[in-house]
């Protein structure tokens, strides 16, 4: 199976979302039936291969946010990094270019929210003990950030904003709302 996935990565680099089991089989020098024994469909093969690329992306975003200690900046940087990296990440493009667009619809799924929550809670330097947040409102913040990603991916604007312009746009309109919410005196503990 490792050889099949390695060949799939090679084919994705060449063919992108147009990669088929026939491409992978030809790259390996085996029959399509051999590949089908391990993966029942092209979609399943591409989904499995893309999971590895997505894990790499998540490690990269975690590295980028590791030193961030401001909640608004962490959300903004996460949105900007995701929006600007999708065009350069073949595996993210692969799942976004998938014809049914299930990823765009699933951007606020439980799994996506769990990943976003984990990145903010575990991968940043934010001092959470100084912020008393409820899990419900924190979940809403993560959902909002994911919806912002979804929006900028589906319609980047005309002309599209570069990373610095997008960062400033979000600092102007999103950061004040996050800071007002995070600084509100009401008791808000995670848990």
Predicted regions and their residues:
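Residue-level preference for short helical/loop micro-motifs built around acidic side chains
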Residues: 18, 43-44, 73, 94, ...
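Helix-turn-helix
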Residues: 3, 7, 11-44, 48
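Amphipathic alpha-helical segments used for helix-helix packing
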Residues: 83-110
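Short hydrophobic clusters on alpha-helical segments that form packing/core surfaces
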Residues: 4-12, 57, 61, 82
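Amphipathic alpha-helical interaction segments
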Residues: 3, 23, 52, 56, ...
């Amino acid at each position: 199976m490792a050889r099949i996935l390695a060949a799939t990565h090679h084919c994705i680099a060449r063919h992108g979302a147009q990669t088929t089991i026939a491409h992978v089989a030809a790259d390996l020098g085996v029959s399509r039936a051999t590949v089908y024994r391990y993966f029942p469909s092209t979609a399943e093969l591409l989904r499995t291969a893309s999971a590895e690329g997505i894990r790499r992306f998540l490690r990269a975003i975690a590295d980028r946010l590791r030193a961030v200690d401001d909640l608004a900046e962490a959300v903004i940087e996460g949105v900007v990094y995701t929006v600007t990296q999708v065009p350069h990440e073949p595996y993210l493009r692969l799942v976004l270019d998938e014809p049914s667009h299930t990823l765009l619809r699933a951007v606020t799924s439980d799994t996506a929210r769990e990943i976003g929550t984990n990145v903010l809670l575990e991968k940043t330097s934010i001092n959470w003990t100084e912020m008393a947040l409820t899990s419900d409102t924190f979940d809403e913040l993560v959902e909002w950030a994911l919806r912002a990603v979804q929006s900028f991916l589906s319609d980047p604007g005309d002309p599209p904003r570069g990373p610095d312009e997008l960062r400033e746009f979000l600092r102007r309109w999103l950061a004040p709302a996050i800071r007002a919410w995070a600084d509100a005196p009401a008791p808000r503990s995670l848990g």
